[in-house]
Amino acid sequence: MEGSPVVVAPWLLNKVLARGARAGRIVEVEAYDGAKDAASHAYRGLTPRTAIMFGPPGFLYVYFTYGMHWCANVVCGPDGEAAAVLIRALEPLRGIEAMRASRPAARRDTDLCNGPAKLCQALDITGADSGGDLMAPPARRRGGAAAGASVPVRLEDDGTAPPRRPGRGVRIGITVATELPWRFWVAGNPNVSR
């Protein structure tokens, strides 16, 4: 995960994001390249909010948006340089009943995790999880907020390879750097947000 977010993003496709008994396969992501990317939270430098984005890689960066939704990112790139990959959609794999309970508005299982806020609701990911190490035992955490998280969020590799030719296009829901084709997805997967 030490590579650029544009390299790490498609590599994350088909990895599994899990929390307790709930898990989903990552089917859509977006890359954000720190100081080089006007759409990145870290574009203007280090702040208390963006500190986790500066590394080391493999940690979870969770932020609150629109005053109501959490969004989850995987920190990547060299330690000390801000970069992250937004997880945009998951294909539900395990704990689907619990996901349905957390997302009662979802009419179909493909609606449970087909957006960044939806997947955070389905897996109960909040700001308390920001700073959690996605790859290590639960004790390894960065930042103060993660200390309150009871069940760690983790990244799993079940042996499913990333797609050879992922879908690729511009990022969604941003107003700057809109021309960059840094959104990647598993082509044909019905859980992709759009």
Question: Could you tell me what each predicted segment is?
Answer:
Residues 1-194:
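Conserved, well-structured core segments that form or line functional sites
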